[in-house]
Amino acid sequence: MTRNLTVLVLVALAFMLAACAGRPAQGVLISTAGIAGTSLVPIYAVTNRERSTTDPGEMFSGERAAETSYAAIAVSIPPDTARKVGEVQWPASLPGNPATDFMTVSADYIDKPRFAASIAAAAKQSGRSKVLVFVHGFNNRFDDAVYRLAQIVHDSRSPVIPVLFTWPSRGELRLRAYTYDRESANYSRDALESLLDMLTSYSSVGEVTVLAHSMGNWVTLEALRGRAIRNRLAGTKNDKLKDVMLVAPDVDVDVFRTQLQRMGVARPRMSLFVSQDDDALALSRTIWGDVPRLGDVNPQLEPYRTELADNRITVYDLTHLAKPGDDAHDRAFEDVTSVVAMIRQRMAQGQTMREHRAIDNPLTQLGDRVTTLGR
């Protein structure tokens, strides 16, 4: 590695470290009694991580498992008056304070039949049949992903059943951890494909949406590619997988073109969230031969503008939503009240992701700073 690249890596790792600096070193998934006035978010997790043998609060490690495991976690979130919406409030020390911190009320290992029963029970109890599958990115421990999904669902008030697909990221900020995570992403595409097949087969599930972040987009797009090829060969139609949201995708833009081509016209509707000031993706671009990453393209420039429109991909350019000190890589989640909530509203109204007009886009209230493409 050249000296300039080494410096860039160190700077970028320091930048990304700030996003995780508040989390405790040990796992936080130890059951603790909640208190009145907090919100409880159930998370149903599916993973191909190994079970943790060293930290009971971790549940699952960053090592790869040969089999898929399941878990059910209930996360307590403090009142909005006691927290900054769009962020996870990590406890400074365990067990934490439920009045100000995210906390775990219950965390259980479950089997596949109980997972299916839990989804059915959640659908019946809430009257909801829409499932949101979250696929996290690089540098995520199991509890990172659990708390982030709980925050997204809570802050967006999304009317969904939250399912976490968490793949074996080591949750470390080292270059070799990045390459390990990338190979883990490759390792996990079949497991995600199987989960999507399983969810869409449930009679209790009416619709599935996937929300992928960063390197999780690679897992997602590869799983979608595999499903599309297999479904096309089998003649499968009327898939319940309707929408896919690609947030800051750490994916080679040339590879994305080939993935789209293999998916064909019967693929799910797609929306893309990009930021041209994303330092994490700038680092990734340098590592992977200076080829643009899908998450940092300028959708107003050719050939992207025409390609995205031709493929009916709705694009949200979040670059100009920048605030001093914010993390561009997580911007869509931190601006959750304006971005994810808008998507939630569209889903609740039964509209497709590309049926909106800029004139009625709630984000135009921010000064017409979001680009939307598609037709």
Feature-to-residue mapping (PLM):
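Lipolytic serine-hydrolase domain surface
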Residues: 21, 25-109, 117-118, 125-126, ...
